[in-house]
């Protein structure tokens, strides 16, 4: 949406095309991987490389629960070579969660971790609007919990699900949190000047718990509004209810690398309005916090964040600075 609405173009002034400039798993109508457009076929060095949803949305565990990788999905050794080459030749890299699936080749894992400037913990989580709604709760969660704790799944209402390869934790709004703002995301103080247009908002999606390497800047943080009971459940997972959401690694002479520890770009806009001059302002104005609705996060946090990242890209309309 952003590339189209903001009129970003290649250096030859041609517009980006999400159908031809996308590489990775290609899905059929049922969401199954039907083929793959290999990154190795890329024949130019991009200004921006955005890496997300590398498993093709075929598995809502992100590989952490069943330790599997769908055939044709994930970052391959060849993909990593292209990514590294693009970065070394000036490309800005933006990556979202789920890159570090447990089935990843060890050399690729090491290179990705170094490139993004982060360390994984093996924990992912998700906001659940109603823990009794099994169209929203992942189907593997109740049996995993019941096997682990030996009791029936009897949770209800909004909550947070946390899972690793061998453990699951459920936090309920009614018992483990101070308010209905279970998980928020905000820009950190040192980056308010650059990203001040990003509002503090609730986050209602998948996220992961990662740790920044030394020298990696934490632009934004997640925060659980847990009470003492909730914090007790988080022992061994987090030392603090505040953890990294958006990070940036900068190396002198290289373009920055951004890592988002959440499913940030999970939103589909109304295509008919995309080219409308004031579309972004209208979307921000009509978006408000509705528990479980991701649109407010997209328009009041993610979109203004992304507008500040591709500064210097060719654009006939305007600069992002």
Task: Identify the function of each model-found stretch.
Residues 7-84:
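Post-signal peptide N-terminal segment of secreted/secretory-pathway proteins
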Residues 41-44, 86-88, 211-213, 251-252:
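Extracellular/periplasmic catalytic domains that process cell-envelope and extracellular macromolecules
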Residues 54-58, 93, 99-103, 223-227, ...:
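Solvent-exposed loop/turn segments at secondary-structure junctions
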């Amino acid at each position: 949406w952003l590339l189209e609405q903001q009129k970003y173009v290649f250096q030859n002034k041609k517009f980006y095309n999400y159908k031809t400039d996308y590489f990775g798993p290609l899905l059929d109508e049922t969401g199954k991987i039907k083929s793959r457009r290999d990154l190795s076929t890329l024949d130019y060095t991009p200004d921006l490389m955005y890496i997300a949803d590398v498993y093709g949305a075929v598995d809502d565990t992100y590989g952490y629960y069943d330790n599997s990788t769908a055939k044709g999905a994930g970052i391959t050794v060849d993909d990593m070579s292209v990514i590294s080459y693009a970065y070394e030749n000036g490309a800005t890299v933006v990556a979202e969660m789920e890159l570090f699936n447990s089935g990843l080749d060890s050399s690729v894992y090491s290179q990705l971790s170094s490139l993004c400037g982060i360390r994984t913990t093996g924990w992912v989580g998700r906001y659940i609007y109603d823990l009794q709604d099994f169209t929203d709760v992942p189907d593997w969660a109740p049996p995993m919990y019941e096997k682990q704790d030996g009791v029936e799944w009897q949770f209800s209402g909004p909550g947070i699900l946390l899972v690793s390869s061998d453990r699951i934790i459920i936090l309920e709004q009614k018992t483990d949190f101070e308010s209905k703002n279970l998980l928020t995301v905000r820009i950190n103080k040192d980056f308010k000047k650059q990203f001040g247009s990003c509002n503090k908002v609730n986050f209602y999606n998948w996220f992961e718990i990662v740790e920044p390497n030394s020298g990696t800047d934490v632009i934004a943080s997640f925060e659980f509004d847990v009470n003492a009971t909730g914090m007790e459940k988080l022992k061994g997972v987090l030392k603090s209810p505040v953890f990294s959401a958006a990070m940036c690694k900068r190396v002198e002479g290289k373009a920055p690398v951004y890592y988002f520890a959440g499913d940030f770009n999970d939103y589909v806009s109304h295509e008919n309005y995309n080219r409308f001059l004031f579309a972004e302002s209208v979307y921000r104005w009509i978006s408000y916090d509705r528990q479980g609705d991701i649109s407010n996060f997209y328009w009041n946090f993610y979109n203004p964040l992304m507008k500040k990242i591709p500064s210097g890209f060719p654009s006939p309309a305007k600069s992002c600075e």
